[in-house]
Amino acid sequence: MGSNKSKPKDASQRRRSLEPAENVHGAGGAFPASQTPSKPASADGHRGPNAAFVPPAAAEPKLFGGFNSSDTVTSPQRAGPLAGGVTTFVALYDYESRTETDLSFKKGERLQIVNNTEGDWWLAHSLSTGQTGYIPSNYVAPSDSIQAEEWYFGKITRRESERLLLNAENPRGTFLVRESETTKGAYCLSVSDFDNAKGLNVKHYKIRKLDSGGFYITSRTQFNSLQQLVAYYSKHADGLCHRLTTVCPTSKPQTQGLAKDAWEIPRESLRLEVKLGQGCFGEVWMGTWNGTTRVAIKTLKPGTMSPEAFLQEAQVMKKLRHEKLVQLYAVVSEEPIYIVTEYMNKGSLLDFLKGETGKYLRLPQLVDMSAQIASGMAYVERMNYVHRDLRAANILVGENLVCKVADFGLARLIEDNEYTARQGAKFPIKWTAPEAALYGRFTIKSDVWSFGILLTELTTKGRVPYPGMVNREVLDQVERGYRMPCPPECPESLHDLMCQCWRKEPEERPTFEYLQAFLEDYFTSTEPQYQPGENL
């Protein structure tokens, strides 16, 4: 993403330097794939070039569950009953208990799972301390499985792996292993590299699986397991751009909810500490839940919405889980309503763009941020949900320019007359598609229109859309066919994308899936000759 990223400093990050070894220089670039080979392994798992493959004594551990990423990491999550009767798990991170019923543990601790049928929090017994309590299921992985390896990142995308590895503080050879996006059952080794022509970049090597077991990048060098492959390339570049040096740094994922059965919580369990912002309908605070857990708290003015309608909608909202959506943790459902979410320490995207950091952001960072937002909205699209109020003020920013969509679905519940009139003073008319503003037809396609407006906010570093025009004028002009011109220094190709989002007929606007793909590949497919300008 560029030099604006900074390495996570807290003790929660999982990072390990691999054993230094001799420097073996090899050619850069990916290896050609050949036919499925059959060659034997030596005692260390590395197979020589001239003998028949002997399957390992123990079968490769089965993959367990899926993956779901948070700010900067994906972590194993339960996808069903424990695979193959596995009940012993290993902790991937430290966890400090938040209630009397959950269990503290340290990274590397082995845990016996007592009951995993209760959703995101499992009852577990620590084999180290002898204590029993609830644990977040996405903080552990089956013992001796691939997920338990620090370098295994599971189902993250190629783009997300680059986002993590392109941290200026990562040394050459920083790496991770992920599932292949294109070949079922295969993996990909992603490695950070540096050269004078490209600067910091990432190379991706497909790890192929043998029919009879084992793995290889190039057919001349084969291994019984991924662990042996990683150990070998940590000592020898052997054709990679660089030998593997350091596991890609990661931060703890968000837990799914605050604790076991902590959904409707008492107001007294929250402490409001630092006021972060104020809007038409309430305030946003940084605070603490139960004296243990940092959270963000949105307080709504009484009368903003019906508590019953809010609680019903919140039940739907809490099921929306994606690494690019701000996670809803808990609610206080009696007025004044409190909405408790994960805390994002850089605040709203709008304030971030207008602040000190905004002036240093260039097009690659801004396009990457827009791709993250499109990724979150593509999930909303797949879930047949509608945001209704997509704009920079409702996007939150965390470390390393991570962006997450917030406040999805709340706009539908607001009962204020100045808002429900749709052309009242509190209604975000400049972001709203004409069919939604005029006739109340809010759909995912009206969200696409709003995303086009959000792109102008990004490329102008937070300027209000339609400068010099009042709401009524905007509505009239847009109905007559007016569309905002290309912002200064913004490539025409990006303005063309905005105009696609602003097509009059909703069904002619692109999908968020398309927008995500376009933006993620923007500098390879659309603007490969990009050169930084004064502002972009």
UniProtKB/Swiss-Prot annotation:
Ranges in a coiled coil: none
Gene Ontology terms for molecular function = ATP binding; BMP receptor binding; cell adhesion molecule binding; connexin binding; enzyme binding; ephrin receptor binding; heme binding; insulin receptor binding
* Residue numbers spanned by region Disordered: 1-49
Its domain of life?
Answer: Eukaryota
Q: Which residues carry this modification: Phosphotyrosine?
A: 187, 419, 530
Gene Ontology CC? actin filament; axon; caveola; cell-cell junction; cytoplasm; cytoskeleton; cytosol; dendritic filopodium
Quote any Pfam family the record assigns.
SH3_1
Q: Which residues form the active site?
A: 389
Instruction: Kindly state the subunit structure of this protein.
Output: Part of a complex comprised of PTPRA, BCAR1, BCAR3 (via SH2 domain) and SRC; the formation of the complex is dependent on integrin mediated-tyrosine phosphorylation of PTPRA. Interacts with DDEF1/ASAP1; via the SH3 domain. Interacts with CCPG1. Identified in a complex containing FGFR4, NCAM1, CDH2, PLCG1, FRS2, SRC, SHC1, GAP43 and CTTN. Interacts with ERBB2, STAT1 and PNN. Interacts with CDCP1, TGFB1I1 and TOM1L2. Interacts with the cytoplasmic domain of MUC1, phosphorylates it and increases binding of MUC1 with beta-catenin. Interacts with RALGPS1; via the SH3 domain.
**GO terms classed as biological process:** adherens junction organization; angiotensin-activated signaling pathway; behavioral response to cocaine; bone resorption; branching involved in mammary gland duct morphogenesis; cell adhesion; cell differentiation; cell migration
Compartments where found: Cell membrane; Mitochondrion inner membrane; Nucleus; Cytoplasm, Cytoskeleton
| Source organism of this protein record | Rattus norvegicus (Rat)
Q: Which residues form the SH2 domain?
A: 151-248
What EC number(s) is this enzyme filed under? 2.7.10.2
Q: Per its database record, what is this protein's job?
A: Non-receptor protein tyrosine kinase which is activated following engagement of many different classes of cellular receptors including immune response receptors, integrins and other adhesion receptors, receptor protein tyrosine kinases, G protein-coupled receptors as well as cytokine receptors. Participates in signaling pathways that control a diverse spectrum of biological activities including gene transcription, immune response, cell adhesion, cell cycle progression, apoptosis, migration, and transformation.
Q: Please report the record's description of how this protein sits within the membrane.
A: Lipid-anchor
**Record-listed ATP binding positions:** 276-284, 298
Q: SH3 domain: from which residue to which, for each copy?
A: 84-145
Name the reaction it catalyses. Answer: L-tyrosyl-[protein] + ATP = O-phospho-L-tyrosyl-[protein] + ADP + H(+)
Q: Where is the composition biased (Basic and acidic residues)?
A: 7-19
UniProt protein name: Proto-oncogene tyrosine-protein kinase Src
Gene encoding it?
Src
Residue intervals of the Protein kinase domain: 270-523
